[in-house]
Amino acid sequence: VCAGTTPEIEVETLKWLMDIVQDAVDKPLCIDSPNPRTIEAVFKYAKQPGIINSVSEESEDKCDIIYPLIQGTDWQVIALTCDSRGIPSDVQTRIDITKIMVEKAAKYGITPDRIYIDPLVIAVSTDNQSLLKFVEATKKIKEMYPTIHITSGLSNISFGMPFRRIINQSFLTLAMYAGMDSAIMDPTNREMLATLLATQVLMGQDRHCRKFITAYRKGNIGPKKE
């Protein structure tokens, strides 16, 4: 849930949005705001532990506010591999930022399995090495912290490109193979769901292809049944 409003009304709007969503579904929330103080203000209104989006090294206070907030809870957190200089163009800087954020988290008893690292994929229209850098960063991060999670804003890869959906689908498969185990994406998109399930089949993550077959029989993937 993200309010996306002006700072003056963000807390009020985000709380309203959280209430609306929690009245409709019994699912954990991913609370999203660029302002850690906003997250701090609405945190208590979540009915169950979810995910905080996000911390980074952009400013000194993000980790210092969010980590103590989720200390001793089951909350998880998304950590962006950027700092005050912006999004790194190289892999090593993303690795270095990851280490800093994981080490800070450890001081509050937050283990790597509660952290979702976002290596920040850049639009391929501006950097045609974007996927390769994302994959390399993902593999190295998983080598250092095997239990850590990897996520991404999936559609960022195709920004500025025509036929975006095929680029997004291809990115999903390659990123999953590299170690990405979650993504910010539309769960109602049939093509993306089919790609995700097919990739799980090919990676040996769907025993006897049961999830894929079940989704097809239910009409969730494949041609729409009349």
What do these predicted ranges mean?
Residues 223-226:
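Long amphipathic alpha-helical segments
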Residues 65, 72-221:
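Catalytic alpha/beta core domains of metabolic enzymes, predominantly
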Residues 12-116:
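Catalytic core of soluble alpha/beta enzymes
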Residues 1-27, 121-131:
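Glycine-rich, proline-tolerant flexible connector loops at the mouths of alpha/beta enzymes
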Residues 8, 59-61, 146:
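Short, charged helix-to-loop "capping" segments that act as catalytic/coupling loops
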